[in-house]
Amino acid sequence: MTGPDYPKLVAAVTVPVPIATSYFQYDQQGVVFNMWYFGWFDDAMTQFLGEVGYPYTALNADGLDVQLVHTEADWRDAVRYGEQVVIDVATERIGSTSFTLSFAVRVGEQVRSAGRTVYVVVSTDGSGKRPVPPKLRGVLEATLTEARR
């Protein structure tokens, strides 16, 4: 990804997450309808956590969850029916109670969309936000984008 709004995702700190596209996600123009990209980001986040060593189910078992508080995307080109999608995921920022992930939706080496999402850590008992736990912080720090190191 390039441009001032997104840090460059560096292969050494990204986790590629394959995403299966489905027929129902395509519109009359034969491309993935734009709302699906946000669902893909969330799906990629849960797969990303598993890949880096703290599966979403373990986070929940520890009494924690995450809530999306901000998301954004820039479209560069369409994903067309039958194309294989991979989303590169990297940690952009880690705060005291939140973290930001960057996403690059690509087909082959071509980035079709880029985005970011801010998640806040919350307690599963409904008592509110919590500090990013040490285990989660550790796996996120291992994938901080080079722009943030």
Across the structure, where does each feature detected by a protein language model lie?
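Core beta-strand residues in small-molecule sensory/regulatory alpha/beta domains
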Residues: 104-106
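Hot-dog-fold acyl-thioester-processing enzymes
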Residues: 2-68, 124-149
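Hydrophobic beta-strand-centered segment that forms part of the acyl-chain substrate-binding groove
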Residues: 48-98, 112-113, 119-120
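Generic serine detector
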Residues: 22, 96-98, 102, 113, ...
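Well-ordered beta-strand positions in beta-sheet-rich domains
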Residues: 16-18, 102, 114-118
